Amino acid sequence: MDWKLQKIELENFKFFKKPFEFALNGKNILLYGENGSGKSSIVWGLYTLMESHKKPVAEIQKYFNPDNDQNLRNRYSTRTEHSSIKTTFIPEGRAVLPKDYEISDTNISTKTAGDDFIRLTTAAFDMFNYRMLSDWIYQKNSR
């Protein structure tokens, strides 16, 4: 069965202080915009959630712990404000319920026993960014 990413929700994560929903509706997207507009935060949020199944719980929790130097919380959020990354995947052409995943200061649903969806999806997941494109162009032009 084919699944598509319907939306990413970020709250108190990097650039996004207020709850932010980015609806992809299963489409391919190209993110562009001014510096400091949150593009990297969206990509980093998706990457962090997708890779979380590989990490111990403590390694995931540090991203939401305001006392940890490696936290990814919005710098203007208070210590008590909820911080999270959520995704919803929808099945293509089937009457099956969507799959929702969250990593946050209170919940890590990507490590649920018996649910291999994130692990299997990550195996086919590749982040393509400007560094990869730049390296590819450099290698091609250096020949």
Task: Describe the residue ranges of each PLM region.
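N-terminal nucleotide-handling cores and adjacent loading/scaffold lobes of large enzymes
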Residues: 1-143
